[in-house]
Amino acid sequence: MIELKENERIDYMLGEQLKIIQDGQSFAFSLDTLLLAYWAKEAIKNRSRVVELCSGNAAASLYMAAFNKAHYDDVELQEDMVSKARRSVELNDMQDRITVYQGNVKDAGSFLRKDSYDVVVVNPPYFKAPAGHKLNPDRSKAIARHELEINLEEIIAVSAGLLKMKGKMFMVHRPERLGEIINYGFKHDLAVKTVQPFVSRRGQDANLVIVEAVRSGKGDGLVLRDAIEVHEADGSNTPAIKEILEAKLPEEKHYFYVLLCSDGSFYGGYTNDLKKRLEAHNSGKGAKYTKSRRPVEMIYLEEYADKRTAMQREYWFKHHDRAWKEKFLHEQGVKF
């Protein structure tokens, strides 16, 4: 049972597919966060290692993790945000995939492995904090919005240090800081390759950009994409934004399958990726039983919406003798 503290509530993302703990008194995730997560997720594979810097309550990582099986490390300075992030991760049963660290992003290289991440995602403080500048009296909100604990160059330097060669950084920021992002990127071996602007309404100046940069990438070939409109004339979200906010999670399919081995025996198994599993069996990496009985042929399969049922069918098939298996397969119209 996840406990909520005073002023906390549970909000939803992706319709009602994800839950997240927020506090009406502190900084909540915004559309900026979801736009960043939506763009970055396209670069993330199931085996990717991803780090989110300035992660807040882990909204971006939760969103991205819903679309793949990658592992995420989140770094957030503020204790109250870390608490909400960790409980939100638990609320969505993602403890084995998202790890939340409390610390200053400047120090991330001391507790995260350098040169090891495929993707860095960051929604940094947007505004500088010159002497005498009036800040939000709420310290938590001031830190989230202004460069009080870390500045833009430091964030880019840390991002570059964590990325593998050719790894990608995705950053959401204000257009007026774009020149600095490009400059600091070159300085720290991060070549900006794509800039995606967003406008509140067509005809207005951009008020947000998402930048994609590549570590040790070539300095030429920057693509400035057509601006995406956020709001219709009546103030409602455009179809492009609705797609991001209400995107449906991919439905994972689960299979019970039967292989015919080279010695004429049968092997029953479970998978959620038929092609990859068959390739594994025929390369000798699928199972101890099939390793010495290659090549194998998939002769029967059943599809299920849940993993448990498919694995029960695997167990059921394996615990019958040869005669029963032959009879079962013949009844299903399988010729062998």
Residue ranges and their predicted role:
Residues 2-44:
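Class I SAM-dependent transferase core
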Residues 205-251:
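SAM/dcSAM-binding transferase cores
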Residues 40-122, 128-133:
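Conserved SAM/SAH cofactor-binding pocket of Class I
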Residues 148-206, 210:
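Conserved Class I SAM-dependent methyltransferase catalytic core
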Residues 17-18, 134-143, 291-296:
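Short glycine/proline- and charge-enriched loop/turn segments
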Residues 22, 102-103, 173, 196:
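Short loop/edge segments at beta-strand edges and connector loops
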Residues 124-154:
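Mobile active-site "lid"/loop adjacent to the S-adenosyl-L-methionine
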Residues 250-287, 291-323, 332-336:
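GIY-YIG nuclease catalytic motif and its immediate N-terminal context
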